[in-house]
Amino acid sequence: MNDENKLIIYQVFTRLFGNNNNHCINNGSITENGCGKMADFTAKALGEIKKLGATHIWYTGIIEHATQTDYRRHNIQPDHPAIVKGKAGSPYAIKDYYDVDPDLAKDVPERMREFENLVQRTHRSGLKVIIDFVPNHVARQYHSDAQPDGTSQLGSNDDTNYAFSPYNNFYYIPKSELHGQFDMKGAAAEPYREFPAKATGNNRFDAYPNITDWYETIKLNYGVDYQNGGTCHFDPIPDTWTKMLDIMLFWAGKNIDGFRCDMAEMVPVEFWEWAIPQVKEQYPSLLFIAEVYNPGEYKNYLFRGKFDYLYDKVGLYDTLRAVTCGYESATAITRSWQSLGGIEKRMLNLSLIHI
């Protein structure tokens, strides 16, 4: 890669940028602590980011995720507080794949329009737009109120009598209620109920997720029967594959320039091999960046999975940290890049892991 094509990505946690409240309180609400807005990325602000040498800006937390903020007046179903991490919620517990986080909008009913305007401002500033695509898991109370007509809800046609079915969108623990090993009530009057329990996002296939699990999320089913030797059921194409492809095409149609694919290695490489070329057929310049932490899978996701880039967290980042802390000598840096075996130009280096 020559310098003209070199990517320099500026990551920003969108809800923090522009929030000038210097007196935030622990566990405070959006009213008490405030929240950054998409409108805070003015032409001036974006111009300053461009001056840093950035080519792309990765807006973290754009897609609507679970939150304890009540938006029922805007016809957004509330989330039970027991399954939301923090008041604002995790940006990786997606609640509606087809919508924008209302916290980020100055005018909530116009949140999608505000995002489209943000993309336009970013492009006018000479920067390209990357957003997260979170394919492995969703919020426990996922419900899309913005999905296009003719689109079915995730899980709406699932047969919950089966722990695994290649036709289901989720994995289930049949005839079992969720018994989370965490506060199942939170600030609510009644505890959270889930029957039958669904498998938790970090591949926990029982009804007892604990506080260290991704307990606020549920695992999506791409046709892999993990509890029976990881057998794959990819013919016919699983319904989840089709739904995820449609979601990527929806956001690609908003003129974004790339997806940073969260925990891409927890989704079978066969899905990416099938989906990415179909997206690129319509949007050939769209970038796909994968979060993969197993070096043994790097080439698989690059060459078979068709990703453009991976980011080198367990290689260079961890090595630099070890050298800085005195656990390794500087020669470890050379060993790190040599271990990539010729794919270093497709690895993104970072100084901080994402929030």
Task: Label each region the model flagged.
Residues 137, 149-150, 159-180, 243-351:
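Active-site-proximal helices and loops of the catalytic beta/alpha 8
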Residues 1-128, 136-138, 143-147, 159:
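N-terminal structural segment of carbohydrate-active enzymes
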Residues 35-49, 235-252:
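Short, acidic/polar
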Residues 65-90, 136-212, 303-310:
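Aromatic- and acidic-residue-enriched segments that line the glycan-binding/catalytic groove
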Residues 7-11, 56, 126-130, 258-260, ...:
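Structural preference for beta-strand elements that scaffold enzyme active sites
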Residues 3-30, 204-233:
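N-terminal small/glycine-rich loop or linker at the start of catalytic domains
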Residues 353-355:
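Conserved small/polar residues in nucleotide/adenosyl-binding loops
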Residues 46, 98, 115-123, 131, ...:
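Short, well-ordered alpha-helical packing segments
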